[in-house]
Structures are given as C-alpha cells and as structure tokens.
Amino acid sequence: NQEYVQATVHLQHAEKFTVAGEYVLPMRAVFYDKDGNKHNIAGGEVLIPINVVDIAFANAAATPSGTMIPGSNYQLSLSTPLQYGTIENLTDGDTEQYGYLPHGTSTLTIDLNQTTTVKGIRIGMYILTGFEYYTDKVRVYGSTDGAKWLPLSEDIRLHETTWNNINATKSVNVRYLKLEFSVSDSYGSLSEIEVFK
C-alpha cells in the first residue's frame, strides 16, 4: 500500500551547498496527530536527491557582449529532427528562415571545435501571426569533452520575441554547449542560434 507524494523541500541552510553536484538528503517521514503529537512513520525513511547547479547563464535584455562566432565555425546537431525547416536555417543569419521543434523536449548540441570562453547565446524565433507556436524554455549545459555535461542554468523562460538573449553571468570555458528546449504546444519556433565569445 505504498503511495507517492510530491513535495517541495525548503532548506534552512541552503548556503551549505557550495559545490555544484548531486546530493542525497536522508529524511524521515513523520505525521502529527490531532493533538499535535509527532509520530515516526514505520518504514518512512526517505532519500531526497538534490542537484545543485552553479548558475552561469541567465535571460537578459541586452545582446551578449563580445564577438559573435560565425555559424560556419561550429557544428549543430539535434536530438530530434525539426518538424519544418532544416538545421542549416539555424545559422544562416535570417530569422525568417525557421524550423519547428516538436512537442516535448529536444536537445541542440553545439560543437565549438575548441574550448572557448562563451559570453552568451542568442536564440531567434520566427514570429508569425496566426501561427503562434513558440518554444517555452531552455536549459543550458556545457562540456569540455562532449561526454560529461554540467548544468549551467536553470530553466530559462523564452519570450515570444524575435530574439532572446542569454548572457553568461560568470566565466564559462567549454567546447560543447547543449541547449535543452521544452515545447508545450504542438510545435516550437526556432530560427537562429548565435554564440558569442
């Protein structure tokens, strides 16, 4: 007779988690009776996984500083094919040449060909009245070897505008970037990817 319960945990001393990584907190499930007495639940030991992220990218109003890397200097690969358009549209400099990501989660991997100090990313979306299919959010990961990935952001909400700016909040040195897009509608517009160093 087991049940699953979804809960939110607020840590009293979150500042103790200073190193990014995965932690497991052992906890005990308890309940309080109508008189306010605390009771341990038999077999109520709970292990709560916590993933601590060192935030390095955040949504910004300003275009990333630095120099835009030409699209011909890096390679893109998608975990799922675009529903419309081609992957080449994402680096052609034209926001009116676009593609649609499918519903759900899609991952775009960017190989910069060498370790690079990344100052920001711009994500272009095609805005078309009557066909309001937009990508909801993105999460950024980075890697130096393409095998071990570190989360570099929380979910970043994308605005329904032609350009969304994601700026580095600290020094980021990676060869690979992975953008994990979430689409809640049938499709999510994606027209351009620009990387700044």
Language-model segments: residues:
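Aromatic sugar-binding surface patches on proteins
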Residues: Q2-H10, T162
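Extracellular Ig-like/FN3 beta-sandwich strand-entry sites
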Residues: Y4, A20-V24, V172-V174
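Short, surface-exposed loop/turn segments at beta-strand-coil junctions that are enriched for proline
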Residues: Q12-A20
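Disordered, acidic Ser/Thr/Pro-rich linker "stalks" and the adjacent N-terminal cap
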Residues: N51-N113, Y126-Y133
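Interdomain boundary/hinge segments at the C-termini of tandem beta-sandwich modules
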Residues: I48-D54, V195-K197
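A short beta-strand element within beta-rich, extracytoplasmic domains
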Residues: T116-G130, L179
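Trp- and acidic/polar-enriched beta-sheet ligand-binding modules for extracellular glycan
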Residues: H103-T105, G130-K197
